[in-house]
Amino acid sequence: MSRVGKKLLEIPSGVTVTLNEGNTVAVKGPKGELTRTFHPDMEIKIEDNVLTVTRPSDHKEHRALHGTTRSLLGNMVEGVSKGFERGLELVGVGYRAAKSGNKLVLNVGYSHPVEIVPEEGIEIEVPSQTKVVVKGTDKERVGAIAANIRAVRSPEPYKGKGIRYEGEVVRRKEGKSAK
């Protein structure tokens, strides 16, 4: 049995989970609504505000899907109840972030400012010129948008300049030594 898959998933108050045909699960909560279709072999049950995921056999594919399905359901429930956020820091002289309407405008050493338009359901906040926070209900999309922002100018190993995740440690390298 999968250690993750066999865990029961309690549904918090204020969150409703509906199981539709074709193994499609819709989760609704105070922060929003998420819908996802899961593999037809996975059996998802809702009993007394508890979600359980069972697998039909011990085949390698089913074992892998079991834990994955349980984790994705857990992320959906957590997303609509609490939400997810990912913080980014801008390190470098003159590196700034600003919000222009719905867009994020980054000045990170290029000859032009870089504009990033978030997807629907994703919110970008700029608490200070060197900090950016990506918020949303879908953990996967929040992480993807944060990765796209980081990819604009990923941290370089010599001076450490660039956009990094909050708390990320950039491995530094020594420069060339003169003869």
Swiss-Prot record:
Q: Which GO terms describe its biological process?
A: cytoplasmic translation
Q: What Pfam family does this protein match (any one)?
A: Ribosomal_L6
Q: Quick one: a GO cellular component term? A: cytosolic large ribosomal subunit
One MF term from GO for this chain? Answer: structural constituent of ribosome
The UniProt keywords, alphabetically, are: Ribonucleoprotein, Ribosomal protein, RNA-binding, rRNA-binding
Q: Which InterPro entries match?
A: Ribosomal_uL6-like, Ribosomal_uL6-like_a/b-dom_sf, Ribosomal_uL6_a/b-dom, Ribosomal_uL6_bac-type, Ribosomal_uL6_CS
Report the family membership: Belongs to the universal ribosomal protein uL6 family.
Cite the record's note on assembly. Part of the 50S ribosomal subunit.
Record's function text:
This protein binds to the 23S rRNA, and is important in its secondary structure. It is located near the subunit interface in the base of the L7/L12 stalk, and near the tRNA binding site of the peptidyltransferase center.
Protein name (database record): Large ribosomal subunit protein uL6
